[in-house]
Amino acid sequence: MTQHRQTSQPRPVAKPEPNSIQLADLPLRSELVGAQPYGAPQLDVPVRLNVNENPYPPSEAVRKDMAKAVAKAAKSLNRYPDREATGLREDLARYIGFGISSSQIWPANGSNEVMTHILQAFGGPGRSMLTFTPTYSMYPEYARNTHTNYVTRPRNASWGLTTDEILSAIEEVKPDVVLLTTPNNPTGTTIPVAVIDEVCAGTDTIVVVDEAYQEFTDAPEDSSIALLPKYGRLIVVRTLSKAFALAGGRLGYAVAAPAVVDALQMVRLPYHLSDVSQVVARVALAHAPEMLARVDELRETRANLEDWLQLHGLDVVSSQSNFVLFGRFADRHAVFQALLDRGVLIREVGPTGYLRVCAGTPCQTDAFRTALLDVLPTAPRLVPEEDQ
C-alpha cells in the first residue's frame, strides 16, 4: 500500500513589532521640536479645489508621447541621468523667450527644491531672508530647513507692495535674500515689474521673484525675466505644476545670470533630477500650446468666481491667478468644514476670516457654488470690515 506523505504547511512568521520609540525621544534639532510636516489636506472627496492645481489632465496625445518618452528612458535607467539636464534647459530657454540661454536656467524637483537651493547658496546660518505676509506658507519651511533667519513685514491694505515699502523694509532688516511673490499666494495680487525694477536698482541684496502663477495673469509676458540683463542678483522662479498641469511631475526652475546658476549647482545633490522627470517635462514643453490651452478658460472661471462671490455679499481680493481669496468669516473653519461635509475641499489659509478656492472645471465650480449657497445662510457672521 502506497503511503502519501503529507506536506507540512509553513508556519506563518510573526512580523516583529516596530520599535516603540517616540518622536519626543529622538534628538531632533531644536527648531523641529513640536513642528508638524507641511502639507495641505489630501482627502478623497468629490471636489478638490484646495491646492491650486490645473483641474485638466494632459490630453491623450500628450500622455501617449510622455509614455513613449518614459519607455525610452527606462532602457537606460541603470545609468545616472544627465546631471546638467542639458536638453531640458534648452527647451525651457526656448519656451521662456526673452533671449534667455540654457546657461541661465536651473531646473529641479519643483520650485520647492529650487527655493531650497537658493537659500542654501545665499542664505544659511547667520543670514536672513525677508518676505511680505500674507504669503506662501512654505517659505518659513525653506528658511528653517536651511538655517536661514526668516523675517517678514506686512503687505499694505490692498495686499500689494510699493517700491518704498519694499526698500524701507530692506533698509530696516538688511536681509541677504528678499523674496517677492507675484502673483502672491494666497491673495492673487501682483507686484508691477516697474516696482521690481526699482527695487533691484535700490539694493545689492539677492532679489528672488516667485512667478509660479505668472501664466494665469492678464499679461503673462509682463515678467521680471525681462530685467535679468540689468541685474545680476535677480532670480526669477517658476514651475510647471500650475498652468502646465504637471503638478505630479515635480518640475520647477530658476532663471538668472549664469553665475547664479553656477552657485545653485554647488549646493545641488548629485543627479538630483531623474531621467523620467526630465523627459516628461520635455514632452510637456514640446506641447506647450496644448498644455496651456486651458489657461484662458481658467482665467475666465476665476474672474466669474470673483463676480459671483461679490454678488453674494462676500469680500473678495481681486486675483491675477487661478484662485480667489474670499471672506470674511468670523469662524472660517466652520465654513471650511461645512463645505467639506458637502464634498467640497477648499483651503483654510491666509488672513483671518478668509478662505481660498481655485478655479476648477465647470462641474467642480458649480458644486462649490451649490455647497456655499447651502452653507452661507447659517454661516458665522461676516467679520466687520473695521475689525480687519
Swiss-Prot record:
It catalyses: L-histidinol phosphate + 2-oxoglutarate = 3-(imidazol-4-yl)-2-oxopropyl phosphate + L-glutamate. Residues 1-21 are annotated as: Disordered. GO terms for molecular function: histidinol-phosphate transaminase activity; pyridoxal phosphate binding. Keywords: Amino-acid biosynthesis, Aminotransferase, Histidine biosynthesis, Pyridoxal phosphate, Transferase. Pathway: Amino-acid biosynthesis; L-histidine biosynthesis; L-histidine from 5-phospho-alpha-D-ribose 1-diphosphate: step 7/9. The lineage of its organism: Bacteria, Bacillati, Actinomycetota, Actinomycetes, Propionibacteriales. CDD domains: AAT_like. PANTHER family: HISTIDINOL-PHOSPHATE AMINOTRANSFERASE, HISTIDINOL-PHOSPHATE AMINOTRANSFERASE-RELATED. Its EC number is 2.6.1.9. The keyword Transmembrane does not apply. The modification N6-(pyridoxal phosphate)lysine is found at residue 242. It comes from Cutibacterium acnes (strain DSM 16379 / KPA171202). One of its GO terms (biological process) is L-histidine biosynthetic process. The keyword Kinase does not apply. This is Histidinol-phosphate aminotransferase. Belongs to the class-II pyridoxal-phosphate-dependent aminotransferase family. Histidinol-phosphate aminotransferase subfamily. Homodimer. Its cofactor is pyridoxal 5'-phosphate. Residues 1-10 have a biased composition (Polar residues). It is an enzyme of class 2 (transferase).
